[in-house]
């Protein structure tokens, strides 16, 4: 059994060794640039961890794990373009270094490369893996569209938001685990339990992100807090604040949502103060714990020893208590 840290080192080394020797360089240089940015690599690590529950040698799953990471970075590349984001992981985004058209085309190439890497799995698993991967990719598009639609709405409900983050974030974590389990020879029941584990962990993970954007320590978080507040992003925090606010609090919240000329620090302080008075931090923590517990319940019934599941149990605890 490998630790999550050991698996991270292995997949980082494998990705660093990738050579994109095809031309033109203008298409492939941005791909190499995006993959060189690093990141948590949580999705390929989860795939390797699920595989490692059943098999000791994880090298046979390096290509599919690379595929899931290339796919994830493709979505980030296009997200950055849609959001007009200037930075990603402390570096300039592809459309800033090159241009919009290059970002679109290199992103498209990454999607194709992701499918090529994913298809490098045993023939007996190929259809199941590719069917799940394709469904997941489509669901992520659905989640992204929901998120974009929410920008134009002021009546987003909790259940809609949770469904959006399930599609936009959770399904790829869940698929990473299920694909790893299938390739490792898990039973259909275990593969589905690990999928449920990833699904619930993903929702809890996103809720933690929502929380950290308001209450994170800037020095630890690595970026300024309050970004979601400044752009009126429909997070769990804002949705629950609007739901539980009294008349005066609702008026103040709506003022800060609609005002266009404001001091950023003042807006963050005012909205955070409203969140504190309304009590949304506790509401978010409770919902996060609910999904965390569901994830652990699914992991508990996976039919391998507790010792072999220890790293997954440790990982979800680290994600829930992280400060970044």
Specify the residue positions occupied by each region the protein language model found.
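All-alpha prenyltransferase/terpene-synthase fold signal
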Residues: 1-324
């Amino acid at each position: 059994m490998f630790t999550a840290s050991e698996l991270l080192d292995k997949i980082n080394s494998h990705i660093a060794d990738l050579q994109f020797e095809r031309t033109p360089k203008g298409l492939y240089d941005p791909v190499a640039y995006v993959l060189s940015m690093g990141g948590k690599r949580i999705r390929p690590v989860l795939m390797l961890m699920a595989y490692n529950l059943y098999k000791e040698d994880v090298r046979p799953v390096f290509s599919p794990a690379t595929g899931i990471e290339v796919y994830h970075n493709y979505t980030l590349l296009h997200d950055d373009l849609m959001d007009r984001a200037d930075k990603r992981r402390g570096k300039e985004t592809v459309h800033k270094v090159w241009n919009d058209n290059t970002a679109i085309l290199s992103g498209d190439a990454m999607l194709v490369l992701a499918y090529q890497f994913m298809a490098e799995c045993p023939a007996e698993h190929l259809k199941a893996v590719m069917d799940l991967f394709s469904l997941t990719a489509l669901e992520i598009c659905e989640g992204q569209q929901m998120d974009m639609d929410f920008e134009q709405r002021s009546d987003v409900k909790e259940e809609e938001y949770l469904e959006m983050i399930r599609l936009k974030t959770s399904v790829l974590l869940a698929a990473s685990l299920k694909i790893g389990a299938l390739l490792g020879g898990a039973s259909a029941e275990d593969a589905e339990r690990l999928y449920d584990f990833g699904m619930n962990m993903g929702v809890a993970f996103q809720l933690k992100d929502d929380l950290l954007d308001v209450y994170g320590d800037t020095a630890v978080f690595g970026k300024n807090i309050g970004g979601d507040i400044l752009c009126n992003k429909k997070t769990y925090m804002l949705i629950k604040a609007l739901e539980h606010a009294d008349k005066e609090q609702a008026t103040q919240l709506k003022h800060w949502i609609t005002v266009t000329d404001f001091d950023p620090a003042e807006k963050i302080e005012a909205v955070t103060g409203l969140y504190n008075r309304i009590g949304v931090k506790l509401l978010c923590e409770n919902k996060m714990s609910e999904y965390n517990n569901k994830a652990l319940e699914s992991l508990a019934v996976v039919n391998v020893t507790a010792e072999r599941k220890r790293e997954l149990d440790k990982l979800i605890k680290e994600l829930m208590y992280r400060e970044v």
